[in-house]
Amino acid sequence: SRIEQEEIFGPVLSVIRVKDADEAFRVNNGVKYGLSSSLYTQDVNLAFRAMQELDNGITYVNAPTIGAEAHLPFGGVKQTGNGHREGGWEVYEFYSETKVGYVDYSGTLQRAQIDNYDD
């Protein structure tokens, strides 16, 4: 249906009847958007399976937050229109290069630590 294929932001509840988790995952993953999904279950195996298999930026299990994760780099996947992946601390790693420099002011030649020598 059309409501399955739209990325709706607002007070809208869509109820889609499915026969099992496999079908629910197919419906979820069959849309071109992937901001977030919610799952309500007491089955911890199903919860972790959902977090692994659902094709979206964030998976809520039993609604643990209010949905304002601006500090995280999830931003959604596929053609979702909300946010960027450059959120959270990971942005520093993405846009950074690490360099190392060693300075010796002793004025003497230093031998490698692996050298075995007698002086």
Residue spans of the language-model regions?
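Conserved C-terminal structural/oligomerization subdomain of aldehyde/semialdehyde dehydrogenase
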Residues: S1-D119
